[in-house]
């Protein structure tokens, strides 16, 4: 086996870092384009079954343009330009004392010129979310609590994230594997 | 020099497979937007009445007594055209819309249903009451008097993979809220 030179090792490590930073930059670009701090989230509970199962990936959008009220935006326009939160939209929101965001459907919407209040409910839940809110909150606020609106989804891919969280050993196996692959991989001459 | 080994063949195969799968998913995702299915409904909802009275629900607004409304309606809507090979569920909901001094737009879901097949999407219902347990219909100002609402059927199409899409039928006539007079005990 050819002896691994120091320079070659550095080149391999640099290549791995390039791959990782490209993924990170892609994620941040998506975050910027959608005005959403977490444009991709994983479903962790069953409250939105049967539409979303545990382990599904959701793609979010948090842009809030003002539309001409008479014109209903098409799905294409919603995806390209974003749209305000509407009744029946599935939103991701966070509450002050809950670390994990919640994905539920808007069932009550109150809009005025400078403020939008709403109440959500999980499709698989019997009652709405008011009982989950802290005492000081009766309505969710569009600006303060809503992280994004669900635009699309992909099944099963999020299970990888859940497994990595539930079984921490898998993290080290994966990182170790990546490291070994980087060092062992030969460059074609 | 390229070494032709099982490892190289396997690597090439899975690399090509992942590329093909990626483009297949992209095609499925975007065809759902380009080839979107529409439904035109002709007055799907007829509302008999909307009544309200003071009541208390343990799970609604911290068990505080306030006015809650209930709606009685007929529905005749065929949403089976929304289904194609990539459709997973259609969620339909009846939305009450009205204006108040404080909010130009108030929209409240009063009834909903999850449709799991095209056959189930042909809906015909008579004298149906809105689901007041799942969707307690209260007003932001806690005052229904003098207000009128229109009722619209909305739907969300959940795909097996790709973008969600939305739709709505035409609204009903404006229906005023009536107070239920109860005998004192």
Curated annotation (Swiss-Prot), chain A:
Cytoplasmic domain ranges by topology: 1-8
What membrane topology was assigned to this protein in its record?
Single-pass type II membrane protein
Q: Where is the active site?
A: 47, 104, 129
Subcellular localization is given as:
Endoplasmic reticulum membrane
Q: What is its EC number?
A: 3.4.21.89
Query: Which BP terms from GO are recorded?
Result: signal peptide processing
Catalytically driven reaction(s): Cleavage of hydrophobic, N-terminal signal or leader sequences from secreted and periplasmic proteins
* Transmembrane stretches, start-end: 9-25
Report the function annotation for this chain: Catalytic component of the signal peptidase complex (SPC) which catalyzes the cleavage of N-terminal signal sequences from nascent proteins as they are translocated into the lumen of the endoplasmic reticulum. Specifically cleaves N-terminal signal peptides that contain a hydrophobic alpha-helix (h-region) shorter than 18-20 amino acids.
Q: Name the family the entry cites.
A: Belongs to the peptidase S26B family.
Region annotated C-terminal short (CTS) helix, chain positions: 173-184
Domain-related comment: The C-terminal short (CTS) helix is essential for catalytic activity. It may be accommodated as a transmembrane helix in the thinned membrane environment of the complex, similarly to the signal peptide in the complex substrates.
Residue positions with a glycan: 114
One GO cellular component from the entry?
signal peptidase complex
The record's keywords, sorted A to Z, are: Endoplasmic reticulum, Glycoprotein, Hydrolase, Membrane, Protease, Signal-anchor, Transmembrane, Transmembrane helix
Give, as one word, the top-level EC class: hydrolase
Which stretches of this protein does UniProt put in the Lumenal compartment? 26-189
Under the GO molecular function aspect, what terms does this record hold?
A: peptidase activity; serine-type endopeptidase activity
Subunit composition and interactions: Component of the signal peptidase complex (SPC) composed of a catalytic subunit sec11 and three accessory subunits spc1, spc2 and spc3. The complex induces a local thinning of the ER membrane which is used to measure the length of the signal peptide (SP) h-region of protein substrates. This ensures the selectivity of the complex towards h-regions shorter than 18-20 amino acids. SPC associates with the translocon complex.
The protein in question is named Signal peptidase complex catalytic subunit sec11
Read off the InterPro entries from this record. Answer: LexA/Signal_pep-like_sf, Peptidase_S26, Peptidase_S26B
NCBIfam families, alphabetized = sigpep_I_arch
Curated annotation (Swiss-Prot), chain B:
GO CC aspect terms:
endoplasmic reticulum; signal peptidase complex
Write down the InterPro entries for this protein, in alphabetical order. Answer: SPC3
Regions that span the bilayer: 13-34
This chain is glycosylated at 148
Q: What is its main location?
A: endoplasmic reticulum
Topology with respect to the bilayer? Single-pass type II membrane protein
> Any ranges marked Cytoplasmic in the topology annotation, and which?
1-12
Q: What does this protein do?
A: Essential component of the signal peptidase complex (SPC) which catalyzes the cleavage of N-terminal signal sequences from nascent proteins as they are translocated into the lumen of the endoplasmic reticulum. Essential for the SPC catalytic activity, possibly by stabilizing and positioning the active center of the complex close to the lumenal surface. Essential for viability.
Q: How does it assemble?
A: Component of the signal peptidase complex (SPC) composed of a catalytic subunit sec11 and three accessory subunits spc1, spc2 and spc3. The complex induces a local thinning of the ER membrane which is used to measure the length of the signal peptide (SP) h-region of protein substrates. This ensures the selectivity of the complex towards h-regions shorter than 18-20 amino acids. SPC associates with the translocon complex.
Protein family per UniProt:
Belongs to the SPCS3 family.
Its recorded name reads Signal peptidase complex subunit 3
Upper taxonomic lineage: Eukaryota, Fungi, Dikarya, Ascomycota, Taphrinomycotina
């Amino acid at each position: 086996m050819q002896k691994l030179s120091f320079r070659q090792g550095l080149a391999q490590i640099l290549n791995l870092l390039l791959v990782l930073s490209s993924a990170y930059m892609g994620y941040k670009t998506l975050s910027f384009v959608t005005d959403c701090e977490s444009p991709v989230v994983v479903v962790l509970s069953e409250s939105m079954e049967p539409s979303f199962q545990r382990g599904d990936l959701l793609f979010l959008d948090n842009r809030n343009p003002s539309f001409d009220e008479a014109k209903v935006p098409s799905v294409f326009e919603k995806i390209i330009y974003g749209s305000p939160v509407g009744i029946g939209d599935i939103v991701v929101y966070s509450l002050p004392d809950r670390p994990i965001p919640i994905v539920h459907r808007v069932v009550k919407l109150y809009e005025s010129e400078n403020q939008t209040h709403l109440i959500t409910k999980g499709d698989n839940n019997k009652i709405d979310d008011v009982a989950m809110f802290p005492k000081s909150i009766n309505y969710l606020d569009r600006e303060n609590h809503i992280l994004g609106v669900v635009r699309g989804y992909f099944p099963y891919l999020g299970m990888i994230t859940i497994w990595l969280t539930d079984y921490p050993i898998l993290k080290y196996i994966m990182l170790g594997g990546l490291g070994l692959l980087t060092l062992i991989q030969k460059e074609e001459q | 020099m390229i070494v032709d080994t099982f490892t190289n063949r396997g690597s090439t195969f899975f690399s090509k497979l992942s590329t093909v799968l990626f483009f297949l998913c992209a095609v499925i995702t975007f065809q759902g937007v380009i080839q979107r299915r529409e439904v035109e409904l002709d007055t799907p909802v007829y509302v008999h009445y909307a009544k309200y009275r003071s009541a208390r629900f343990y799970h609604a607004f911290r068990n505080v007594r306030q006015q809650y409304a209930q709606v009685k309606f007929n529905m005749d809507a065929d949403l089976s055209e929304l289904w194609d090979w990539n459709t997973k569920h259609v969620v339909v909901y009846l939305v009450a819309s009205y204006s108040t001094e404080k909010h130009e737009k108030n929209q409240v879901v009063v009834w909903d249903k999850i449709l799991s097949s095209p056959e189930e999407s042909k809906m015909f219902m008579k004298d149906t009451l809105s689901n007041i347990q799942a969707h307690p219909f209260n007003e932001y100002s806690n005052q229904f008097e003098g207000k009128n609402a229109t009722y619209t059927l909305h739907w969300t199409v959940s795909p097996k993979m790709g973008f969600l899409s939305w739709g709505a039928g035409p609204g009903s006539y404006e229906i005023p809220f009536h107070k239920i007079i109860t005998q004192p005990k």
